[in-house]
Amino acid sequence: MKKLTLAIVAVLSCVFFVSRCALAQEWAKQRLEQSPRHHEWVDIKYGDRTVHAFIAYPEVKSKAPAVLVIHEIFGLTDWARELTDEVAAAGYVAIAPDLLSGFGPKGGGTSDYAGTDDAMKAVSGLNPDTVTADLNATADYVKKLPAVNGKLAVTGFCWGGGQSFRLATNRHDLSAAFVFYGTAPKDVSAITAPVYGFYGGNDARVDATIPDTVDAMKKAGKKYEPVTYEGAGHGFMRAGEDPTQANNEGNVKAREEAWARWKSLLKGL
């Protein structure tokens, strides 16, 4: 009986854990559902590819710049979409492509994957050239929208931070690139847009690359302004607004400061 009781407890614990994982971003989904802004899904087609993308529109009178949002290594999650809505709330047409489009187990995207581990493996295995092509197609699409004034910026987080830096080497119509805790490409010579970096002080893996990036950008004559937020870890923009996180003061503070800086920089587009 004791063994049976322990087994039942173990099963219930697993069910609880899985449920917690599945609902890990329920708070982001709820905020998204409560947003007063217009959202829509679009399919962007080029060649033999179809990229599923989420768009959030600002409530403004005139045309606005567009911001291309590149998701974390977890794929286009509820938080990634909620962040996209926050960018729209600041006054910009924000678009976030699901870069797992067509690669899911059922031919879909991020939502096809059973969990974050599977999505992470899939994102990690994406062909860099395909990613860049998907981002270029998305950028071309959003720039043509009637609500956009022709200006374009890119931002990315974690894995997406590195991709935003990389896109700046491939696309020369960017007004700015905002890199959140992402690493730089090896060759930065083709970059034409200013690059603004946002890093957590407790993120040694990424932070160790900053000095070399500063040197490379300086030698290439490019504008690069990194800021490190002490007490914050990797992924602080998500963790800093997650109400389920404990002992989260460093991430909360970093997110507030980074978001204030980001909005100020966006106004300069």
PLM segments and residue spans:
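Short alpha-helix in the alpha/beta-hydrolase fold that links the catalytic acid
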Residues: 83, 207-217, 229
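Short beta-strand/loop motif that positions the catalytic acidic residue
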Residues: 197-199
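Bacterial N-terminal signal peptides
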Residues: 7-17
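Primarily recognizes the serine-hydrolase "nucleophile elbow" in alpha/beta-hydrolase
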Residues: 135-192
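C-terminal catalytic histidine-bearing segment of alpha/beta-hydrolase fold enzymes
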Residues: 218, 223-269
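Short beta-to-alpha linker loops that shape the active-site pocket of alpha/beta-hydrolase fold enzymes
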Residues: 99-103, 183, 232
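Serine-hydrolase catalytic machinery in alpha/beta-hydrolase-like enzymes
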Residues: 28, 32-35, 41-144, 238-244
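Acidic catalytic loop of the alpha/beta-hydrolase fold
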Residues: 202-207, 234
